[in-house]
């Protein structure tokens, strides 16, 4: 009779220790909370110490320019872009093959597909590179983005980046504003527009603007 298989609890070797150190992070918030600023600051901290980073952003987000991550305070950096059909594990593996990379930073992470978030998790586990994602939690209809839902399920560590509603309470929701200045209830989830089209609100004032479900 075959003995049951066992899981080795021996201390990992050097490679194993490196792999265990890497984590998948998700920094989430509503609009205009400074997520891109935090991403660029994190990247700068690595670069200042002589380390290289790999920046990724959605190819259709051109508010700061194609292949650029920009913040409202005026700083920006070049980034590689991805589509929703790209294999992000393959992109990261190809970047690592070019040379050392201390961290991967992904802006507008809500636009990723569920499969792409799993690809990031695989890159963390198998390639040993930490990945920091920054994105919105919910859309203007109060629904989770697919990428954000997957990150909330899979990320090793999560951090809420806080901003405030006009009433002073923490903002957790966002509305999309139409040409008439009123909150929209319908529309495509993916619609990249100016920051002035979106307003971050607490749940009470979101319900007041949009109406109860």
Regions found by a protein language model. Name each.
Residues 42, 115-123, 147:
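A short acidic, amphipathic alpha-helical/loop segment
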Residues 108:
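Walker B catalytic acidic pair
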Residues 111-112:
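Residues immediately C-terminal
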Residues 164-180:
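Conserved AAA+ ATPase core "coupling" helix
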